[in-house]
């Protein structure tokens, strides 16, 4: 029995090295050995097998509502951020307007008023405006300084206009044509019984519209024609009409110096041509000569928050008629302080062409001045051009209260060859009376003021007064038609959007010339109302 225990112990001792060797040295990877190894590991990772992860249930978070607190304390900004976003501004669109307008009126003394205007919007860049106007009177007037003698007077003016504009990207092209006709008669016992003025003109020009461009320009050309039918102090003579043709060319070039300064050179040339009853056929003396004027106006402008300056000069040249060279200032200075108070001063001048159009605007009943010598009795001549040597003034504007403005000013004006007119009674030379244009050098000092008040576009009130003290060196009687006191008063009431009411009064008194005449003052009271439907 003891031998059995010995044999068993030897067998156990012989088997122990092989077991230890199996644990330290793994055999070739096989399915059997992999299974054995796995069974000997704790919490093994099984390769080539799918795992299923089970997550615990998660509860959804809840948010507790709290009262929002805003910062209401003001802090002064010491600097503006460089990348500040600009505010959005919507595109302004003008409300649509009615393209056409028609007005017709008739009153006592045969007063006629007709006006028609229509704007054709051919496209977004093309516009055509057509206008027709006729006004006048035909009635019996009582002549002054007579025993109720009547004058069967008539005066009709007709105007027709066509204006076309095409808008390019930075330029506007404008082409226009105008026609005018004036028919009227003179008072009884005048040297002429009637008169007719016929006018027409053609215009073509381009206008640079980009105000931000460093260099911009404008240019235009005009052909103006005008005829006075009767120009002799005896209308029974045939072919006394005089035709005036003006070829006018204008242009300017502007160069910007930054955002606040610019320099401009403006040029205007007028070529005046005359034909018809312009010379004495028997002697060959010519009283209407063709001539050319050249007007040059260079100036500098400054425009900022406080100052507005315009500094330039008017250089006027004439070739073939009148004085060959003249120069006058073109200066304006304006200083703004406290946003609503303005102190200003200006000195301007320049040539005023006394062409046939200006003669009609001053006095349509005036005859052209007679030629100087008695040998040319019955012939007329062209007046010299008026030249404003200086018109200087200083003034002060202020708005102490919203909507309220007032302006006080004073100045001095000097005119060379100032155009006026005077009356002549029948004489041994002319059997009838007439008005004739005449000229002299004049000057005047003036003072004035104006005030206006506007309340919320409901009520507007304005008043203006100007006093002038005239002086003439040689022909004082020409001052009889000059205004001494000018006053105007206007009230505008706009109670509702469609209703407008206007009330106004104008007063003009003339200078009294001793031992000659004093014209009656002009008093004009007018009232009107309009309602838009």
Regions found by a protein language model. Give the residues of each.
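Residues on the lipid-exposed face of transmembrane beta-strands in outer-membrane beta-barrel proteins
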Residues: 116-120, 160-166, 202-210, 249-255, ...
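Flexible loop and strand-edge segments within Gram-negative outer membrane beta-barrel domains
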Residues: 137-141, 149-159, 173-216, 222-246
